[in-house]
């Protein structure tokens, strides 16, 4: 029986099994981004004012800079993937980190970036998710993959901030897979 299943695997492509692997529909991606936004908010809520400016070592970003880096990338990837213009006030957040030194200002800037991506996904034309675009004038990928790369990026950098919280004696939020 197992041999029969294994023998038929080459006859089935991943696209046949799950077409969303190559061209995800915006709806499931919206749910993931809403969950990621809520999870990131938990990290921001866990941080104290001291944590926002904290750098575990002098040569890496502070907690606040990590969060602003996420926000900048959310805007850049979201804009490239959707064609939606980045709001004028949203460019170069990380370079303007001093303006976001308070928990309230930082949280608003980061949450606004998630709202931008979520809105871009909700407004996305499903038929265009498979279109090829160029990110950073360098990487060619589909619109759907650009949204996926943005998701991967924000997950990576949010995960990096776990150690910032732990080094300040704060228990980070529990994993939020669902």
Language model regions located:
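Feature for soluble, non-membrane regions of globular proteins
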Residues: 17, 119-123, 175-178
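Short, solvent-exposed, charged loop/turn and helix-capping segments
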Residues: 47-50, 122-124
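Bacterial Sec-dependent signal peptides at the C-terminal "C-region" and cleavage site
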Residues: 3-21
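Acidic/histidine-rich, surface-exposed loop or edge segments in extracytoplasmic proteins
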Residues: 16-24, 84-99
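Acidic/histidine-rich alpha-helical segments that form the ligand environment
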Residues: 32, 98-134, 142-153
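Solvent-exposed, charged/polar functional surfaces in cytosolic regulatory/catalytic domains
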Residues: 39-42, 46, 112-120, 160
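Short N-terminal segments immediately surrounding and downstream of signal-peptide cleavage
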Residues: 16-38
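Short, contiguous alpha-helical
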Residues: 30-34, 41, 51-94, 134-178
